[in-house]
Amino acid sequence: MLFIFDRPGRYAFWMKGMKFPLDFIWISGDKITEITGKVGIDQMNLRPQQPVDKILEVNSSWAAEHQIKIGDTVKYESVSN
């Protein structure tokens, strides 16, 4: 799931109600600034080190399996209903 914010910030995320771990990919502009891998179901108040305007949640270990790295450029397209 991709979260897009109007302005950069150090937004807090937590895993309430999740039944499986995730990776958090923190994005500023079009660059990955941080990756928090294997976020457990009991973790609360996760924040990036620096302000971001997007956060991508993916299945645990997905980032490593796909060789996603800090500094990588992110491209995405809008999807209409």
Where are these regions (language model features)?
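Compact, glycine-rich, soluble single-domain proteins
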Residues: 1-81
